[in-house]
A protein has these predicted regions:
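Elongated, amphipathic alpha-helical interaction scaffolds
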Residues: 1-251
Length: 251
């Protein structure tokens, strides 16, 4: 299963796939996020605001996929995490990624503002009043077969029932947005992510897979190599992968 999740993570890193994922999950296929308006940003983080270099043995944090999306109206970071099984700490993990990204942004603001901030509040904050953080949106794509039964909010990782109600209202929340592949409508997707989702939704039945392939033979015949490889990995179709490699060897 680790190999499958690693493959899915690499696939989501493609700009056209990440854009299609957001459009299909959030906008019913409307092309709101354009791949051409996505640019690469840092995926690796050091924790905290310290400028000190971390120890070589320290573990670095890496997002599955993140790109900056810009248009004439806004600039926002779009991230995605792939999960092949429910994860009990996923709200905290996504929050940790977001905090690490905001910390990176603050380090940059502090660096470019060094020596320029004169007022007391700005000097103390190491941030000008006109400086702003870039917002982050993160979605979790769950491609497991069992229903998601893990927390979707930070509060669901806590025991809050006995806490004073006024204090309870002041506990900060962090919510994640989980999209189960089994529940997605593949027609909302325009790239070959459509075929990947369509086939994975039918992975429990070889007959249904064959029916889907016959029905969508035209699109499948034009499927790119990366998606073909992904389908072979996700559906454990080693024989198809072997056939493709043999075909390439023979020219």
């Amino acid at each position: 299963m680790g190999k499958q999740n690693d493959a899915f993570t690499a696939y989501l890193g493609r700009a056209e796939v990440l854009a299609d994922l957001y459009n299909g999950c959030l906008y019913q296929g409307e092309e709101v996020v354009q791949a051409g308006n996505l640019c690469e940003v840092q995926q690796f983080y050091q924790q905290g605001l310290s400028e000190r270099v971390k120890r070589p043995t320290a573990r670095r944090r890496e997002r599955d996929a993140i790109r900056a999306f810009w248009n004439e109206k806004s600039y926002v970071l779009l991230a995605a995490e792939a999960q092949n099984q429910p994860h009990l700490t996923i709200p905290f993990r996504c929050m940790e990624y977001d905090l690490a990204e905001y910390a990176r942004q603050l380090r940059y603001i502090r660096l470019k503002s060094e020596g320029k901030l004169k007022t007391g509040v700005e000097y103390l904050s190491k941030m000008g009043r006109k400086d702003h953080l870039t917002p982050i949106v993160t979605i979790v794509l769950y491609h497991g077969t069992e229903p998601w039964d893990a927390p979707k909010k930070l509060s669901e990782m806590m025991e809050l029932e006995e806490i004073d109600p006024i204090l309870k209202q002041m506990v900060q929340e962090y919510q994640i947005y989980v999209f189960s592949l089994e529940e997605l409508q593949e027609e909302y997707f325009q790239t070959n992510l459509r075929e990947l989702i369509g086939l994975m939704k039918r992975r429990s039945s070889k007959t249904k897979i064959q029916e889907y392939c016959r029905k969508h033979a035209d699109r499948i015949s034009r499927m790119d190599v990366a998606t073909y490889d992904m389908i072979c990995v996700m559906l454990n179709l080693k024989e198809l992968q072997d056939k493709k490699e043999k075909y390439l060897e023979n020219g």
